[in-house]
């Protein structure tokens, strides 16, 4: 098949796809599919010759919001491809927050040691971790959590049991989880139903010792409500790889909070994305040409 890579030329990824017998072309009108690796505003108008879109990102909610996702072409994302990297980063965020790394960093002084000793918490100490959005990343995270002997709760749309989770609940039957878990990990796709799912109401149901970790999408959290909850002690802390707004402005109060750990959307990196998406694209091409559902095909109605 002929493909166009847009808007950025990733030579290593291109080499993998071409190594599978496919040809990169410059003009989208000559292509059978597009490998898209940009931001939503950069997405081009699709001519009728484009049969499918391979996106390099795990979720295409930004493209859905922009209104460019439709049934004129088939769509595939990179869901689950970054399970190892994002799950490992999530473990790092959880531990950094519970071990109060931000408190020490902001204090810039050894004198903070008594405060850390008195308030530091331990993941292995009878904790319950709720994973909201237990897809490929969530399943890998469950595996990585096993050595900590935590109780795990998976929350998904269907309520179908998630491998490795102690309990699984459908989203509409998980109201009790807000009061039960010690750590909440958000890996949900961004939809109308999940937009600002963490807000003043749900934060108010959490334990004062609860920690919120977001490696999914920034708008899963109402940021103003989170700031209020962190300031008034409604919850203990947050660890954020994604934020709303993003990038988070340098002057934003979250940067100065000693109960918040922030990483700049680096739970997965471009280097890893480029290394992995070529092989995924080859697999999806093979399935597409066989008339089968692609490995990471998106339901364009649901948006994920």
From Swiss-Prot:
UniProt GO molecular function: NAD binding; oxidoreductase activity, acting on the CH-OH group of donors, NAD or NADP as acceptor
InterPro entries linked to this entry: D-isomer_DH_CS, D-isomer_DH_NAD-bd, NAD(P)-bd_dom_sf
Active site: 217, 246, 265
One family name in Pfam for this protein: 2-Hacid_dh_C
UniProt keywords, alphabetically: NAD, Oxidoreductase
Enzyme type, top EC level: oxidoreductase
Top-rank lineage group of the source organism: Bacteria
PROSITE patterns in alphabetical order: D_2_HYDROXYACID_DH_2, D_2_HYDROXYACID_DH_3
Residues the entry annotates as binding NAD(+): 136-137, 215-217, 241, 265-268
Enzyme Commission no: 1.-.-.-
Family classification: Belongs to the D-isomer specific 2-hydroxyacid dehydrogenase family.
Protein name: Uncharacterized protein Cgl2355/cg2587
Organism from which the protein derives: Corynebacterium glutamicum (strain ATCC 13032 / DSM 20300 / JCM 1318 / BCRC 11384 / CCUG 27702 / LMG 3730 / NBRC 12168 / NCIMB 10025 / NRRL B-2784 / 534)
